[in-house]
Amino acid sequence: MFVEKVLERTTNLELCSILILLVISLSIYTFYATLNTYLRSVLLSLRLTGPPSLPFLGNCMLVTDKDLMRRCAGKAFDLYGSLVRIWVLLFPFFAVLEPEDLQVILSSKKHTNKVFFYRLMHNFLGDGLITSSGSKWSNHRRLIQPAFHHNLLEKFIDTFVDASQSLYENLDAEAVGTEINIAKYVNNCVLDILNEAVLGVPIKKRGQDVAMMEDSPFRQGKIMMPARFTQPWLLLDGIYHWTKMANDELNQKKRLNDFTRKMIQRRRQIQNNNNGNSERKCLLDHMIEISESNRDFTEEDIVNEACTFMLAGQDSVGAAVAFTLFLLTQNPECQDRCVLELATIFEDSNRAPTMTDLHEMRYMEMCIKEALRLYPSVPLIARKLGEEVRLAKHTLPAGSNVFICPYATHRLAHIYPDPEKFQPERFSPENSENRHPYAFLPFSAGPRYCIGNRFAIMEIKTIVSRLLRSYQLLPVTGKTTIAATFRITLRASGGLWVRLKERDHPLIAH
């Protein structure tokens, strides 16, 4: 008995020793691998050029540069070449600009992980499709993707039409003939669409819900990440945690999450009362059904994904619509071609558009794509490489951080001659046929291609066509240029100003 206890104790001690040695060995290996990747990235960065950087801060202060997009990103290829060195604090990043190189990275499932600073958006977007990585991202993508099937998207057209009509009525009541920042009105319209399409709050039948949605935290959301980069010490969570900014962000997250949970409860009650068939099905309904058949998809996951769609969809689509309308204002010949196309599609009818009508808006789609080329809603994407990548001129080590900059790639003169000019014909079938598929990235590309891209294009077409059928868009003297600024999504500093004039022969009855 004594001998058996000694042997048992010895075996346990040996097992503990082995486990401790294993943990130490793995820690040493991880440290060595991380250090090796870091040193290789630093050595490569020293052979590349990029914008001037500051000691310790690197290029973080570029976030404060209101002229960053035009002065730096728009001319990146001419200034620095196809691979640009960027320092984020003491960490080297590589901005990849050429479509051939981008395809190597974006098309591979091995490079779908996001870099460390995406977690800074968790208190804003939650841990949803935009910010998550690994198995969580791939599982959620697989589960949610069917909700954006072509046949289901068609059911959202009535939502787009109702919101567009509401936008028209608001403009007709207070904006015709005056100078307006069209972005403000468009953003409200897009939020109306998302309220119904994502949360299930009908646009025309809100009743008591109107006040509730007017106070919606999704109208007031503010992302703190850019401010943390301008004060890089706040990138350290141990310091940031004690700031007023962090407290405000946590309170904002609580408001967003609590509000979304109320919406989930509301949709569950509607489903339980068998009233679901009387209302348009929304994304929350789909996600509730997913959670009922997949235990791993929890209510917290529904909240995170709903916040992602509400907040990301609001900024990106709102900007795309506003930029498109503004550019049509500055290019009246393109606006006239869009109006002629709409007259051909609708003839003398004042009916709302169908899915077929939206597909027939081919020239308008060219205009939308050209607006997205010039002003992509998300001008910067970051990825962490899962393995070594050989590009045309350089090799990037596994684990290194890369930037994909659609704003810069969309301005490569050897792909888009005279890149600052608005030319929708670039996207005609004959002109697009031989263009590299990764030369146009408004919705990213590859496995992480934006899940809502077709939803967004349909939404934009519906809003733009509704306004063009009733109004002529005119420029505002002294406000004919765009000062693009980068705040995660692309914004127009100072707004996008237009004048609306009632058409003598509107293409739709009022």
Curated annotation (Swiss-Prot):
It comes from the Eukaryota. It is a peripheral membrane protein. InterPro entries: Cyt_P450, Cyt_P450_CS, Cyt_P450_E_grp-IV, Cyt_P450_sf, Cytochrome_P450_Monoox. It is found in: Endoplasmic reticulum membrane; Microsome membrane. Keywords: Endoplasmic reticulum, Heme, Iron, Membrane, Metal-binding, Microsome, Monooxygenase, Oxidoreductase. Its cofactor is heme. Its EC number is 1.14.-.-. SUPFAM superfamilies: Cytochrome P450. One of its GO terms (molecular function) is iron ion binding. One of its GO terms (cellular component) is endoplasmic reticulum membrane. PROSITE patterns: CYTOCHROME_P450. Pfam families: p450. CDD domains: CYP4 (cd20628). Heme binds at residue 450. May be involved in the metabolism of insect hormones and in the breakdown of synthetic insecticides. Belongs to the cytochrome P450 family. PANTHER family: CYTOCHROME P450 4AA1-RELATED, CYTOCHROME P450 FAMILY 4. This is Probable cytochrome P450 4aa1. It comes from Drosophila melanogaster (Fruit fly).
